[in-house]
Amino acid sequence: MGKKYIESAKLIDKSALYNPVEALDLTLKTAKANFDETIELHVRLGVDPRHADQQVRGAVVLPNGTGKTVRVLVFAKGDKAAEAQQAGADFVGADELVQKIQSENWFDYDVVVATPDMMGIVGRIGRVLGPKGLMPNPKSGTVTFDVAKAIEEIKAGKVEYRVDKTAIVHCPIGKKSFGTEKLKENFTALMEALVKAKPAAAKGQYLKSVSVSSTMGPSAKVNPTRALD
């Protein structure tokens, strides 16, 4: 454990539950790396991800974006391919892109969008895209005929969230350079989306624990009952 991390960790009371603004302030104070660290939100949910009816997955456009340049690959043909190019997609194609991914193990993109009619060919690389979280999905709005809107939202700061095997959602909410106010707006947008996505089958306390941290820094716990303050 580095010296900077140990010094930073002293500023945060591990037993305390902060309100969102306090937690974000502390996270920014403890982000001491010499690059613009990403600020992440971690939420443990009262769900059992082993059950299909307790999956939590979706997407939300963060009001202040992510601070990251997102490269979008679109599987589309004809008019939809032209629409995707016009909307600012970084890569557009069909079979030739599937071949490139298969033969070159090519991953120079961050999000994959596909029109529904292309899912047959995209399915051929599902085993490659799936483990990297790149497989297009209707729930996250990445399988759609409205490719222009999908690209626009992704470029504007749309993030996907998905509960992992341990019932935790990890999601970036911006960069250190955003400052507390912008990060708080993004934090709230994501928390509201998670609450709306609560499965009907989830019983008991839904927000089990909430915390924020920077790429290299310690985490600050947020009081789950105040997470939407």
Swiss-Prot record:
| One biological process term in Gene Ontology | regulation of translation
Give the family, as the similarity comment puts it.
Answer: Belongs to the universal ribosomal protein uL1 family.
SUPFAM superfamilies according to UniProt = Ribosomal protein L1 (SSF56808)
Organism of origin is Clostridium beijerinckii (strain ATCC 51743 / NCIMB 8052) (Clostridium acetobutylicum)
What this chain does, per the entry, is described as: Binds directly to 23S rRNA. The L1 stalk is quite mobile in the ribosome, and is involved in E site tRNA release.
* PROSITE patterns according to UniProt: RIBOSOMAL_L1 (PS01199)
* HAMAP family registered for this protein in UniProt: Ribosomal_uL1_B
Q: Which UniProt keywords apply?
A: Repressor, Ribonucleoprotein, Ribosomal protein, RNA-binding, rRNA-binding, Translation regulation, tRNA-binding
Tell me which domain of life the UniProt entry assigns to the organism this sequence originates from. Answer: Bacteria
Assembly behavior: Part of the 50S ribosomal subunit.
One Pfam annotation, family name? Ribosomal_L1
The protein's name is Large ribosomal subunit protein uL1
